[in-house]
Amino acid sequence: MLNNKGFDFWAGDYDKTVGISDEENTYPFAGYKKVLWFIFQTIMRAGNAVVLDIGFGTGTLTTKLYERGCSIYGQDFSSRMIALASEKMPNAQLYQGDFSKGLVEPLRNFRYDYIVATYSLHHLTDAQKSNFLLDLRNYLKENGKIIIGDVAFETRKDLEECKLKAGAVSYTHLTLPTN
């Protein structure tokens, strides 16, 4: 997995890379637009929802929700991704933090109609996912929902086999800046 510096480096081309993977129906973003559209429609049925996005990246989903009146909160560990998303959503409450360590303090002070995680939770181990999702329940409003749109497999071995079969692109070859 890329660290925050890797995602900072990738941020400028992230949307393009994801779009190509989705269009070519390749791992890991095959079906990306369909997943986001389903989540968008689900949230919009509730009207002006309060939404927390975990690992929001460049804000592809949350920008659409923001433009339609939702209150957006988010946590991402890439400062560059946050900067790009903030340009699109100047009044959103976006914070930097590694969600494998839980929510950052400011986000713990709110309750949400929806907590979404799209293409982010697969970076956690199964145990981390379980603990994190259990903790997130504490931040939902009554009748609130957690919606996950992500790459999912029954076992880690199944995931690795899928990557091999798909000829998945490895981003470990990126040359990162030294500063």
PLM feature spans:
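Conserved class I S-adenosyl-L-methionine
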Residues: 1-46, 147-169
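Class I SAM-dependent methyltransferase SAM/SAH-binding core
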Residues: 52, 58-103
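Short amphipathic alpha-helix with an adjacent loop that forms part of the alpha/beta core around
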Residues: 102-110
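A conserved beta-strand element that flanks and buttresses the S-adenosyl-L-methionine
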Residues: 116
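Short catalytic micro-motifs in class I SAM-dependent methyltransferases
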Residues: 119-120
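A short glycine-rich, Lys/Arg-flanked "PGG" loop and its adjoining helix->strand segment in the class I
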Residues: 130-142
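Conserved small/polar residues in nucleotide/adenosyl-binding loops
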Residues: 172-178
